[in-house]
Amino acid sequence: MLLLKKQTEDISSVYEIREKLGSGAFSEVMLAQERGSAHLVALKCIPKKALRGKEALVENEIAVLRRISHPNIVALEDVHESPSHLYLAMELVTGGELFDRIMERGSYTEKDASHLVGQVLGAVSYLHSLGIVHRDLKPENLLYATPFEDSKIMVSDFGLSKIQAGNMLGTACGTPGYVAPELLEQKPYGKAVDVWALGVISYILLCGYPPFYDESDPELFSQILRASYEFDSPFWDDISESAKDFIRHLLERDPQKRFTCQQALQHLWISGDAALDRDILGSVSEQIQKNFARTHWKRAFNATSFLRHIRKLGQSPEGEEASRQGMTRHSHPGLGTSQSPKW
């Protein structure tokens, strides 16, 4: 699919702008109707003056989206350029964000979570087959296509995606609680970082709180570097061993031993009947409501901040001794009382 930038003096000659859908770091997304038809798009409007120094990021997003055609990935339909703006006409998805939809459900089971994760795995496996690493998978980037109950889930936001020309990538990026250990260590990394993020998302979908959490970034990073998480009681008491086994394979600290997307798709929790049909909506929705209003989980992240922290603390990147001696772990967001550190 080759999408050339179509030149226009005024985007209103191409689309009727209806309303604002949202905004990002340097763009706004508008609901727009194509002139001469009833076709609606999500129009990403990027001022060129905001692009100075960021041109490569946007060009990369366009390059990635041009290569993609998958039923569970939001499509780029057209690209327009005016003297002042760049416009990306994206497939319109109207079903809302993942967590919001879970909260609105009448019931929610492991089988529902398994079905969701399976769809995302299929989309990410497709990206990986093209040599594309998403690099910023998180619940906010998982949207429902329609408001209907049987709607499919869609992967969105390819601003940080990268086409993996060689074997590994080197630029650290992502969102704090979802980044893989090798990314924090600033080692070359690849597709396995997406699998790790899917492990974090799968964990949250089954209990409503994140596996790695602390108000202090250095301690959060230390937990991630050690892959230090637990299946806390009572939140995990009714979750199957198969689900826990699946998550362990995705949250494997060593990227060489971590499941690939294909291996994850073949796990019985995804491909078989291992996912339980017990309703877990009450517990999960309560924890989602409690934990994901936190702006902490929406901050942008660059791993250089982590390196500054550990240098000040005199730690190695593995973050062992200084964190044992100098930091106290805050209460886990899913738990009512402070826990002892998980050393």
UniProtKB/Swiss-Prot annotation:
Protein kinase domain: residues covered: 15-270
Disordered: annotated segments: 314-343
Coiled-coil segments on the chain, per record: none
Primary location class: cytoplasm
Identification of the protein by name: Calcium/calmodulin-dependent protein kinase type 1B
Matching SUPFAM superfamilies: Protein kinase-like (PK-like)
InterPro entries linked to this entry: CaMKI_beta_STKc, Kinase-like_dom_sf, Prot_kinase_dom, Protein_kinase_ATP_BS, Ser/Thr_kinase_AS
Annotated catalytic residues: 136 (proton acceptor)
Subcellular localization: Cytoplasm; Nucleus
Top-level taxon of the source organism: Eukaryota
One GO cellular component, as annotated: cytoplasm
Keyword annotations: ATP-binding, Calcium, Calmodulin-binding, Cytoplasm, Kinase, Nucleotide-binding, Nucleus, Phosphoprotein, Serine/threonine-protein kinase, Transferase
Residue numbers binding ATP: 21-29, 44
SMART domains linked to this entry: S_TKc
GO BP annotation list: signal transduction
EC number: 2.7.11.17
Tissue expression from the record: Isoform 1 is expressed in liver, heart, lung, kidney, spleen and testis. Isoform 2 is predominantly expressed in cerebrum and cerebellum.
Reactions the enzyme catalyzes: L-seryl-[protein] + ATP = O-phospho-L-seryl-[protein] + ADP + H(+); L-threonyl-[protein] + ATP = O-phospho-L-threonyl-[protein] + ADP + H(+)
Homology family: Belongs to the protein kinase superfamily. CAMK Ser/Thr protein kinase family. CaMK subfamily.
Phylogenetic lineage: Eukaryota, Metazoa, Chordata, Craniata, Vertebrata
Ranges where the record places region Calmodulin-binding: 290-311
MF (Gene Ontology): ATP binding; calcium/calmodulin-dependent protein kinase activity; calmodulin binding; protein serine kinase activity
PTM (free text): Isoform 1 and isoform 2 are phosphorylated by CAMKK1.
